[in-house]
């Protein structure tokens, strides 16, 4: 009797690993079959403002990624892109609409980072993964669910690179920035949104990098231009009148505001380059101004790489091929100088 029990146990010990292996193979086969059956995917894209220059270029790059993927893989990609026009309530309704349309994943450029939980709750209930981009929700919200990711450009790095452009210029020739020779570089600051984390960080660290690099600074004034060229130009018009002949440097949180400052400088009959203007983003218009000698420097986050990461994340989540991906992805950046 004991011999039979021993044989039975021995047989079970031998059989268990085989059964486990069979189960794993069956599970893998089922998953592979499910993936193989996927002949299309639907990606919802929610934009905070479609007329934002950087966002519009990113949108175009996303559309190119989708076309390339369709061509290479024979899988139809539908991009449902909606513009909230700066209204969070509108974006919340748009999220509901895309969920009801059966989107496989939502890529969200959130309007108000402090209330991302509303869209997160809707997506989690429907079990639709989220890829936030460009406008970073608060950390607590990003950590609420394992199917949430963020793609962006490190704001501190952007600012440090921007500041270093000017530190290098000052070290080569102090008079390139200190035009009046008073021993101080007198600057004005054009900021994005007052509540946007990138704006706050860029403002702080561009100035701090200049100070750390030994550039003597004098702040004349600063203001919020909400990332917009026209608002920046209007502020610059006021400052050129109020600080006539004093402004030597314009620090801008993005290229559009830098271009607005340049518009004002030209409109007021000031020679291009006599006031140094620096931006961030490396937009096509910004790089054109750089080539023309109107913009002194910018920091580029290559939008094609940015869009590719958003698309690849979305595709991996849909196809079940995303393995051990970090919750945050920071796009590489580089300084561009006139």
What feature does the model see in each segment?
Residues 1-42, 121-126:
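Short, low-complexity disordered leader/linker segments with a strong preference
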């Amino acid at each position: 009797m004991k011999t039979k029990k021993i044989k039975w146990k021995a047989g079970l010990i031998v059989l268990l690993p085989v059964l486990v292996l069979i189960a794993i193979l069956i599970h893998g086969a089922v998953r592979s079959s499910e993936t193989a059956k996927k002949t299309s995917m639907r990606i919802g894209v929610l934009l905070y403002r479609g007329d934002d220059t950087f966002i519009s270029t990113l949108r175009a790059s996303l559309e190119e990624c989708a076309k390339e993927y369709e061509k290479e893989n024979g899988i139809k990609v539908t991009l449902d892109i909606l513009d909230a026009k700066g209204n969070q309530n509108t974006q919340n309704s748009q999220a509901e609409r895309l969920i009801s349309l059966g989107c496989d994943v939502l890529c969200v450029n959130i309007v108000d980072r402090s209330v991302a939980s509303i869209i997160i709750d809707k997506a989690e209930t429907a079990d639709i993964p989220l890829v936030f981009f460009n406008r970073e929700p608060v950390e607590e919200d990003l950590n609420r669910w394992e199917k949430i990711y963020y793609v962006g450009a490190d704001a501190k790095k952007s600012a440090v690179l921007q500041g270093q452009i000017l530190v290098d210029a000052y070290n080569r020739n102090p008079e390139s920035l200190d035009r009046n020779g008073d021993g101080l570089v007198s600057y004005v600051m054009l900021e994005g949104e007052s509540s946007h984390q990138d704006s706050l960080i860029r403002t702080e660290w561009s100035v701090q990098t200049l100070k750390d690099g030994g550039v003597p600074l004098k702040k004349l004034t600063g203001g919020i231009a909400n990332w917009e060229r026209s608002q920046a130009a209007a502020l610059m018009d006021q400052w050129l009148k109020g600080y006539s002949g004093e402004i030597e440097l314009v620090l801008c949180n993005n290229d559009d505001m830098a271009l607005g400052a340049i518009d004002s400088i030209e409109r007021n009959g000031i020679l291009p380059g006599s006031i140094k203007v620096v931006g961030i983003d490396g937009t096509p218009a910004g790089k054109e101004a750089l080539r023309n000698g109107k913009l002194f420097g910018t920091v580029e986050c290559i939008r094609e790489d940015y869009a590719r990461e958003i698309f690849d994340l979305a595709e991996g989540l849909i196809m079940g091929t995303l393995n051990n991906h970090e919750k945050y992805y920071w796009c590489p950046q580089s300084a561009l100088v006139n």
